[in-house]
Curated annotation (Swiss-Prot):
It is an enzyme of class 6 (ligase). It comes from the Bacteria. It comes from Legionella pneumophila subsp. pneumophila (strain Philadelphia 1 / ATCC 33152 / DSM 7513). The lineage of its organism: Bacteria, Pseudomonadati, Pseudomonadota, Gammaproteobacteria, Legionellales. Pfam families: tRNA-synt_1b. One of its GO terms (molecular function) is tyrosine-tRNA ligase activity. This is Tyrosine--tRNA ligase. One of its GO terms (cellular component) is cytosol.
Length: 401
């Protein structure tokens, strides 16, 4: 019983909410492998560390002998998950969905054990649905129940349109749990309504309801908004070792602990020991370096993690400019404002970000901190431009004919 209690405690660690906890404990105490399901709609080709919070939890279940079902929602992706959206999402083509799904499989096996993972596609059963099946599924829930979901409710009360097919999405996702006979389903906190729909439909179809385990949405590099490619505050798992290492080293010490808690493969006990060592005088930077190496090694290898570490020391801690820095060329008719220039050479994602970075004192030209975003660099010269700790470019500005 002590062993089972420690397993249960480790599996629950890092979860935002578990519904219901007693049922999870009861299922684990049976001592038989459980079916652990997690669904992913392949609506974008690349994953970032935010996605791996859930994948890490799946990996834990594998380590304790349970069966992990990595469900690719190729059918539902062609509908588009309306969760958190204030407008109807455009459906994707089957070709795009299948191409993204292939990329997903390659990426997730950097974390999951392929020999202990069943990859399923919900088109396997949803493609067999006929009109009668769909109507019967729709009849299990009311419009009033659907409007309990925050995003639907907001759109309804503000007069924004809700397409009928959007109501079908949570029902179809829930039916996946029926088809797979899932014991546990994992998902982000933003998926709560859809996850609970799986429980309700399993009860309706006469199955033991799944336990729902929700993992938190991890903050991006800014420490405020959730990690997202669209907000440019993410660490992609396909990024180069140097990019990964530099981004992790750029986060605050407070955010570092959040990342370690949710992303490290260390046990809860080991993490507590790390925190205690910092309280006793260990430099948090050293903990961050070890964590950065752990993440880089996971998605690349240990040799590249050490190489990225050495490059980081050379570039940032010693203040050196890399010798192999590629020179960019910008041909313009007349000088342009620095804020616009930074965006043009992809050191920032937008002019507004450029302005913000300059005002924060994060932009240097040839080692000098710049305070004026409207500064115009003379044409006919080369410059070393730095934005923050990890974005750097050698730029030659040339006169257009």
């Amino acid at each position: 019983m002590i062993v089972q209690d420690s397993v249960c405690s480790e599996l629950m660690r890092g979860c935002e909410e578990i519904l219901p906890v007693p049922e999870l404990e009861k299922k684990l105490q049976k001592g038989i492998p459980l079916k652990i399901k997690a669904g992913f709609d392949p609506t974008a080709p690349d994953l970032h560390l935010g996605h791996t919070v859930l994948l890490n939890k799946l990996r834990q279940f594998q380590q304790f002998g349970h069966e992990v079902i990595f469900l690719i929602g190729d059918f539902t992706a062609m509908i588009g998950d309306p969760t958190g959206k204030n407008v109807t999402r455009m459906p994707l083509s089957q070709e795009t969905v299948l191409e993204n799904a292939k990329t997903y499989q390659h990426q997730v096996f950097k974390i999951l054990d392929p020999d202990k993972t069943t990859v399923a596609f919900n088109s396997q059963w949803l493609n067999k649905f006929n009109a009668v099946d769909l109507i019967r599924l729709a009849a299990t829930h009311t419009v009033a129940r659907m409007l309990e979901r925050d995003d639907f409710n907001k759109r309804y009360t503000t007069g924004q349109p809700i397409a009928i097919h959007e109501f079908l999405y949570p029902l179809l996702q829930g039916y996946d749990s029926v088809a797979l006979k899932a014991d546990v389903e994992l998902g982000g906190t933003d998926q709560k309504f859809n996850l609970l729909m799986g429980r309700e439909l399993q009860k309706h179809y006469g199955f033991e309801p799944q336990v729902v385990m929700m993992t938190p949405l991890i903050e991006g590099l800014d420490g405020v908004k959730k990690m997202s490619k669209s907000l440019d505050n993410y660490i992609g798992i396909n990024e180069t070792p140097e990019q990964m290492f530099g981004k992790i080293m750029s986060v605050s010490d407070e955010l570092m602990w959040r990342y370690i808690d949710l992303l490290s493969f260390k046990t809860g006990k080991e993490i507590q020991q790390l925190k205690q060592s910092v309280l006793e005088g260990k430099n948090p930077r050293d903990v961050k370096i070890d964590f950065a190496k752990e993440i880089v090694a996971r998605f690349h290898d240990q040799t590249q993690a050490e190489f990225a570490h050495n490059k980081f020391i050379e570039r940032f801690q010693k203040g050196n400019i890399p010798e192999d820095l590629e020179e960019l060329s910008l041909v313009i008719a007349e000088p342009i404002a620095l804020a616009q220039l930074l965006k043009q050479i992809d050191l920032t994602a937008s002019t507004s970000e450029s302005i913000r970075m300059v005002k924060q004192g994060a932009v240097k030209v040839d080692g000098d901190k710049i305070s004026d975003p409207s500064l115009k660099l003379p044409i006919g010269k080369s410059y070393i431009i730095q934005v923050g700790k990890r974005r750097i470019a050698k730029l030659s500005i040339q006169q257009a004919d």
